[in-house]
Design a protein with these regions (language model features):
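Catalytic nucleophile-elbow at a beta strand-turn-alpha helix junction centered on a G-D-S/GDSL motif
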Residues: 91-105, 330-333
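Conserved, well-ordered alpha-helix/loop/beta-strand core segments that scaffold catalytic motifs
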Residues: 146-158, 220-316
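Secreted/periplasmic serine-hydrolase-like ester/acetyl group-modifying domain
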Residues: 164-273, 357-410, 420
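Alpha-helical transmembrane signal-anchor/signal-peptide segments
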Residues: 69-89
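N-terminal Lys/Arg-rich, disordered targeting/topogenic segments
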Residues: 2-47
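Hydrophobic membrane-insertion alpha-helices, especially the h-region
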Residues: 49-67
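C-terminal regions of proteins
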Residues: 288-371, 375-400
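Membrane-embedded segments
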Residues: 100-183
């Protein structure tokens, strides 16, 4: 009996020890699993961080490379970027068009003499097909009292619309992504749209022209850090035109141009833009077929907007081909100051532009005008010597020779036969 009792006690003791060993083993396994799970979680977390950091570095490098190799004209870059520096809803007059609007008209001079604010949103060689996009971009930030379109972009033959390098100058540099994509769909041929939506595909070979890339990149960096645009888009080349006197130019107003202008007029109406002036600025060559301007005038006025050609007003303005042009298409600093004085009075008289800006805006514009005056004075002195230096926004911040090198290291010829400054030296006109 006692042996059976002892045997049972020993058996139960062994069973209890077995259960305890099993329980401890199970707990140890769970603990090890928990430790392993924590280590795995930390490992996954570190992996995610590494992937995220790599992705961030890749994006930054890709963005830098894309921007560095995006080689478009420096004056266009400065003009477009400068527009975004203007405080919202502070511009009275938007000047839109090709290079005439930034070569022939100075917003700071108009401010000093007439008290209204304006901006020259121009792109060299811009065809009329871009004007709608330019207005669309302007309206994202400004509600101007008057919009002025210089019509030269509509007065060329149809091949003018096929120069994609001019389209890139605008499309690749604007900030509003929706407008950029809409513009590509509207005016770029389908077989070329990929070069606009994926610009690195187009620009990747620009490493061969590293100096030009550096020049345009320097302009982008400079405009990024600029607090405002002192020149308000204005730009000039310090020289006299060497175009032989008596030359004539034939204008075109093709069906394609008419269609683009009609679309622009419809857009102005749809957006409720009430005061619009389509204008022809003075050019050196006489017009061979002035009836073309009558056709433009008829179309514009059929929509209730204004048209004015100032080609016939050159003598009244005081502009002469000997002293006031830097090439056959653009006024030099002498001519632009004369035309700005005339245009400022014309706009003030016809559109009743009141100087009703805040003290802060008036102070800012006064400072911009002061700084622009220095650049304009330097340009006038260089023009007397026909040195050919290019003055634009970056001339406010950099030595004139260096800033000129940024502008004159062209990617392509500008609007109408404009050449790099080193090719522009001509004898001083007496």
């Amino acid at each position: 009996m006692s042996l059976l009792l002892i045997h049972g006690t020993v058996k139960r003791s062994l069973e209890m020890k077995t259960v305890m060993r099993f329980t401890k083993g199970k707990e140890k396994i769970k603990k090890n699993k928990a430790i392993n799970s924590t280590d795995e979680g930390k490992g996954r977390h570190r992996k995610v961080i590494r992937i995220g950091a790599f992705a961030l570095v890749f994006v930054v490098l890709f963005s830098f490379v894309s921007t560095f190799f995006k080689m478009t004209d420096a004056v266009n870059i400065a003009t477009i970027e400068g527009f975004y520096k203007e405080p919202k809803n502070t511009i009275d007059v938007m000047m839109i068009g090709a290079s005439e609007v930034y070569a022939d008209y100075s917003a700071t001079e108009a401010w000093k003499n007439y008290g209204y604010t304006s901006y020259s949103l121009g792109v060299s060689g811009a065809p009329g097909s871009l004007y709608k996009s330019m207005l669309r971009e302007a309206l994202t930030r400004q509600h101007p009292k008057v919009v002025v379109f210089e019509v030269n972009g509509f007065l060329q033959n149809d091949s003018y619309y096929d120069r994609t390098v001019k389209l890139h100058s605008w499309i690749d540099n604007i900030h509003n992504e929706e407008n950029r994509l809409d513009t590509i769909k509207e005016i770029v041929p389908k077989d070329e749209q990929d070069n606009f939506t994926n610009p690195l595909k187009l620009y990747h070979s620009n490493w061969k022209d590293i100096d030009k890339c550096a020049h345009t990149f320097a302009t982008r960096v400079g405009m990024y850090f600029a607090k405002t645009s002192c020149m308000k888009g204005f730009s000039s080349i310090a020289k006299y035109s060497d175009c032989p006197s008596g030359k004539q130019k034939k204008l075109y107003f093709t069906d394609k141009s008419r269609a683009y202008m009609t679309d622009l007029l419809e857009y102005c109406k749809a957006q409720g833009v009430e005061k619009v002036l389509f204008a022809r600025f003075p050019h050196e060559k006489e017009i061979k077929n002035p009836q073309v301007l009558c056709d433009v005038k008829e179309l514009v006025e059929s929509y209730g907007y204004d048209f004015a050609s100032f080609e016939g007003d050159k003598e009244f303005i005081g502009i002469n081909e000997r002293d006031d042009f830097y090439n056959s298409e653009h006024l030099n600093i002498n001519g632009s100051l004369k035309f700005t004085a005339f245009m400022g009075k014309y706009l003030s008289d016809n559109y009743r532009l009141n100087a009703d800006h805040s003290p802060e805006i008036q102070s800012a514009w006064g400072e911009c005008a002061r700084r622009a005056d220095k650049v304009i004075s330097a340009c006038a002195k260089d023009t007397d010597l026909s040195l050919g230096n290019h003055y634009f926004e970056m001339s406010v911040y950099l030595p004139y020779n260096f800033s000129s090198s940024l502008a004159t290291n062209k990617v392509a010829d500008t609007n109408n036969e404009a050449k790099p400054a080193k090719e522009l030296n001509t004898p001083v006109k007496k």
